[in-house]
Amino acid sequence: MKIIILGAGQVGTTLAENLVSEDNDITLVDNESPQLQTLQEKHDLRVVQGSPSSPKVLRDAGAADADLMVAVTASDEINMVACQMGYTLFNTPTRIARIRNSEYLREKDKLFNNENIPIDHLISPENLVTDEITRLIAYPGALQVAHFANNRISIVVVKAYYGGALVGYALSAFREHMPHIDCRIMSILRNGKPIRPQGSTIVEAGDEITFICATEHIKAIMGELQRLEKPYKRVMIVGGGNVAFGVAKRLENSCTVKLIERDSNRAQALAEKLPKTLVFNGDASDQNLLFEEHIESVDVFLSLSSDDEANIMSALLAKRLGAKKAMVLIQRIAYINLIQGGTIDIAVSPQQVTISALLGHVRKGDVKNVATLRHGIAEAIEIVAHGNVNTSNIVGRKIGELRLPMGIIIGALLRGNDVIIARRQVIIEEGDHIVIYLSDKKNVPEIEKLFQPSAFFI
């Protein structure tokens, strides 16, 4: 596939690095990026320096015969104009744009169509991050929750702790503990090293476990791996940006929400838009303010400003003063592994969340959803099976008969309204939504090839 990526920031470069290793022809365009030459030398891709909204630059980048244009510059307006150019001048078949401005998003149905601004898929990082955070709050104790198949199937990452019924026992004991609930353990990380899950594997405290199940069973299964936490009811948010506002808006009807914003004008505006949230104009590093607002009774402290260092420091302070959980928004991916799992419980990366959404539109085959896991190392894909026993490599075959590379696990599938956890004897049928776990994203081309029907399939 020939793909043009506009914007060589964190998202653009990470997307290029993900796709270039999957036998794609990648061209990266940016106006001024010191990384361009380095990226070209490091990876098998082409770079073009110039304005991403310039017809000449797009022509030089090969827009005339590109299969896909992905506009992820820092400017919504440049992204929109670039997609317009791709549609009007070059007939680029598929156009994806990152749009951040909430005013544009509120009018998306009227604005973004082929009669107006021709964008096929919108990516809104702020909305995606808001979704991610609210999922984590809905499942206290989870490190990551990703939904698939119309939210019927979920992949969940948790830490095993003493108090979980399965801790100290073999995985095979799960069926004895919960005979009416099915799930599959996809991976175990122990002391940072992966362990292949087997029935005889003993679950140890501190293990990071990734499992797949019907969404309705998440909490029951988490209770086997750790002592279930009470629902979060008291939430304190730091920051007044779109993410902080979005999270407060979603939570204020079900939780007691307090929000701290340093800028007085922004605090006033937020107070008017969030009638059930208590908004403070103040500094989250002010210990007196935190004490006055009973930080020791806060269930989860969310540091969601645009400043990584400020987020980290305020979360560390909040935990020291008694907050039960701390979650931070982190822009720099390098920071995440340094801080998560220590004093700070969860770090959320807008870049990784955005990359997941982009990959769902870029992957070959009938891919419906993608989630990056373990901060970009692993991946989960929801893909639809097409064809029949004569035209497909998988339809009509038992899962146990498929020759899957090491590290690829078929976890579950949705057939009609039924969630089926993958077992060796399950036969894949046409139209099944299949959720696959890849411990190494380098195996993505193998999955795309496996699910591609033959040329005779109509």
Swiss-Prot record:
Residues covered by the RCK N-terminal domain: 1-123, 232-348
Entry binding sites for NAD(+) 1: 7-11, 30, 73-74, 98
InterPro entries: K_uptake_TrkA, NAD(P)-bd_dom_sf, RCK_C, RCK_C_sf, RCK_N, Trk_Ktr_HKT_K-transport
Keywords: Ion transport, NAD, Potassium, Potassium transport, Repeat, Transport
Residues involved in NAD(+) 2 binding: 234-262
Any one Gene Ontology molecular-function term assigned to this protein's record: potassium ion transmembrane transporter activity
Domain RCK C-terminal as annotated: residue spans: 143-227, 368-453
GO aspect biological process, one term: potassium ion transport
Annotated GO CC locations: plasma membrane
Domain notes: The RCK N-terminal domain binds NAD and possibly other effectors. This is expected to cause a conformation change that regulates potassium transport.
Entry function: Part of a potassium transport system.
Protein name per UniProt: Trk system potassium uptake protein TrkA
Species name: Haemophilus influenzae (strain ATCC 51907 / DSM 11121 / KW20 / Rd)
